[in-house]
Amino acid sequence: MEIQLINIGFGNIVSANRVIAIVSPESAPIKRIISDARDRGQLIDATYGRRTRAVIITDSSHVVLSAIQPETVAHRFVVQKDPAMAMTKV
């Protein structure tokens, strides 16, 4: 099994193999997940002080905050898994 890494902005990288979900931070349940992760010490803030636009949830219950759009992270995730997608325009 090869390790795949995804750039989530500002030089920060997460392991694609460990990502469970990439979601928007707007809903109340996601805000609760962020708050709970902060209380447990499992929140990673990779926004560099900018507005949180994507919340990445991992299989280890860590929650990563990113300043780039969830669609952008998801696109990087798909392109990483299937390089042929990089050649096609959506």
Swiss-Prot record:
Recorded source organism is Picosynechococcus sp. (strain ATCC 27264 / PCC 7002 / PR-6)
**One Pfam match, by short name?**
RemA-like
Alphabetical list of InterPro entries matching this protein: RemA-like (IPR007169)
**What family classification does the UniProt entry report for this protein?**
Belongs to the RemA family.
Q: What is the lineage of its organism?
A: Bacteria, Bacillati, Cyanobacteriota, Cyanophyceae, Oscillatoriophycideae
Q: What is this protein called?
A: Putative regulatory protein SYNPCC7002_A1845
Signal peptide location? none
